[in-house]
């Protein structure tokens, strides 16, 4: 496979062409990744039962925490790689690659050990009941066992994309997606492994994709590659990776905290069925947010390179185009949630499975309408937060990430449900989205004004 876009062209090609070239592969990959999570849930819902969906939903906080550590390394390394290439420092970019490998081994090994040791107490804290903890435990034991594979696969894929190979990054991710979709029904229905089969399919598919990534960086045709001497931790590189990736890390941690509070509230006011309904809503929303994430991934190397080269006019242009596309995506999600909520919920659960299944469908349909009611502006808020991260301003990105989850959403989740029940849980989310988007607009306004007043100002990182 030939190199899709050389780093040097990031500073000269048309922004719209670059965004399409980088974003489309990322969108396809991220959407496919979200779709196979949806397919997992559909197979689990129809092959194991509606309460099994609740068990997987209870696993989401722990999976988000695992993703937090993966994002801390992967997103930080990708942004730093783009900036180093924009500065013309190819060897420094390869040093980042070496640090990524070592950091993933250390962090993932520690997370796996702690997670497996304390799994049952963690799941009970997350809101598991006697009916759901068995499903959650069976699923997470295998997912935790594959944490090193997952972290390494996702981090290296980020660096592949950031170093000028968006199509190859897409192909690698699609490899995992296709294998997962093939293995899931085989393991769940063919081998009768149930929910453990779904987890095993995910880990094995990612292991296959990781092997392709390792081959890429071992090839002499890669712009940056594995070399002798790069596999040593450098405090300065690790510090910058963590600094840039901290916003994504905190966002995932906050997302975990939110899901924990949501699950606890739903268990109190709606029971296990309501938790499963939230699992459905979460996966539907994530389908559209993964498309926005693909747009952000396409934006990242273009922003990082041109920011490193001090081409601020191009930075603003790609930001504007990305925001427009993101708002269109989330508006589509809004329309789906308002027009076809019950039909969407029935994809995951068969109403013929009994009263619990029908209750889950009805609860999910109500939640979809409310949770997605301000979804159009969510795309803008997410792009803005990522933009600050990509230009090396992690403090602003962290602030935006924290305020939506911690300052607005969690307090609302603590205040509204005692008065409104499950309705209060659903209402908390769009209220938090609206206020966070307004705050993001204010910060972005001042940042854009700085760029326009100082078009050639230097910024080191």
Predicted regions and their residues:
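Helix-terminus/linker motif at the lipid-water interface of multi-pass membrane proteins
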Residues: 35-54, 123-130, 186-193, 253-283, ...
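Transmembrane helical elements of multi-pass membrane transporters/channels
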Residues: 21-40, 142, 176, 205-209, ...
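Membrane-helix interface/capping residues of multi-pass secondary transporters
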Residues: 41, 50-53, 90, 119, ...
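Short alpha-helical transmembrane segments in multi-pass integral membrane proteins
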Residues: 1-23, 81-148, 190-246, 303-374, ...
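Small-residue-rich hydrophobic transmembrane alpha-helices
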Residues: 53-113, 150-169, 278-341, 378-397
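Residue-level signal for short hydrophobic patches within transmembrane helices
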Residues: 12, 16-35, 39, 62-69, ...
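Short runs within selected transmembrane alpha-helices of multi-pass transporters and secretion channels
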Residues: 143-161, 172-180, 198-211, 296, ...
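Hydrophobic transmembrane alpha-helices of multi-pass small-molecule transporters
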Residues: 65-68, 112, 180-184, 210-214, ...
